[in-house]
Amino acid sequence: MIVNYFFLLIILLISIVSPLSGNSISGSILASKYSSSINDFQKSADFNLKILESGIDDPAFYNDALLYLVASGNFNASFKLSKKMFDLDIRSPALGLVMIIEKISKEKINESISLVNLFEKDLPPVLVASIRGWMNLKKGKLEDSLYEFKKLSDTDLNFDLGAYYSAIAYSKFSKNEEALKIINKNNDNFKLLGKNFEILKSEIMIMNGESFKVLETLKKSISDFLNDITLKELYHKI
């Protein structure tokens, strides 16, 4: 399950950096406000795509459509749209991120790194360091990965993303004691991630041979999260 956290954390990063790109959403967001207010991002994406199909070739509408496709989870459509945007010489943080995610999903690590370098000026530093860190981790370069993640701990983010990523990095190299040291030090801060953090912590404790201790931890977590089914299933598997 730990390997799946990369994409969850990329979405987390989108939510962190999107307020930093206030001009990335055009006036079309007003016309599709109702759709997005009920979390129907696909309708908002379709709205912008229809505008483009009508002959309007404004980069802002391309960017809006791309953002809404990502928000709706329609990554295949977002990958297709990103190729068209790139060919039209449209550049934006959202485009760079989508193209990078596509290469990552296809395990094309070197191409992913090349895209990070290409879009570095368009992307927030926190995102660049995050992706480079994960790419180094994917290539088996733990120290290089930790170096990039350390940059995240030196930012003004309220959540220590660098420490969280570092804990996951250590666990992927079976250095579970190091991972738990970070988790225990930042436990209160990491709890902001809710049950996803509790699951991660439990899995690392299990890998570190602390099955009895993790049962006690999960009991409390199950109580805190009102008998969450996922946590209960994990508890009964131990």
Feature locations, PLM:
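Generic helix N-cap/helix-start motif at coil->alpha-helix transitions
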Residues: 22-28, 55-62, 88-97, 121-131, ...
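N-terminal leader/linker segments that initiate helical-solenoid repeat arrays
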Residues: 19-65, 71-80, 90-91
